Amino acid sequence: HDVLSRASAVYGVPVETIVAVWGVESNFGDISGKYPLLQALGTLSCEGRRQSYFRGEFFATMRILQRGDLREDQLKGSWAGAFGHTQFMPTTYEELAIDFDGDGRRDLVSSTSDALASTANFLKKRGWQTGQPWGFEVTIPADMSISGESRRNKKSLSSWVDRGLVRADGSPIIQGGLSGSLQAGLMSQIGRAH
């Protein structure tokens, strides 16, 4: 728990969020993939519609090995090349992995400290705003059409307020320092728009 508390303090991401990502991505490190990354990414870089993308991931994997942070036998992951406790792609690893345990290596496979801090760093660098909610439940007016709405079809919070949305408890959407200009989309409980 000390590692999580420190990572949360350094990067401003709640412990619960870091743990949620860890649980979703690898069942807390139990399932991180079985495919050798060099072979998987080498194959994907030579066939299919995303060859260029996977070629970049393949060469990033080679650089990880060259740097010595991980050994080839440690680099096993998903068929698409994500690896470690929180399933980083090799280019994301290069950009955002952290040596949080101070051993001189960024090891997202064997070091839970490095993996969880790197996850918090990833979220922070990708726009996590400390103290702001990632989302909240809302009540949609019965007469409001939500056809075509999704988490990708974002509108300002003020726009959602103008359309009659309130939080599930009946309180206003805009509160606690949230800006009315903040962009937000709708998600259902199963991850699809209503």
Protein language model features and the residues they cover:
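Catalytic glycan-binding domains that act on GlcNAc-containing polysaccharides
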Residues: 1-181
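Conserved small/polar residues in nucleotide/adenosyl-binding loops
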Residues: 193-194
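Extracellular/periplasmic bilobed ligand-binding domains
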Residues: 182, 186
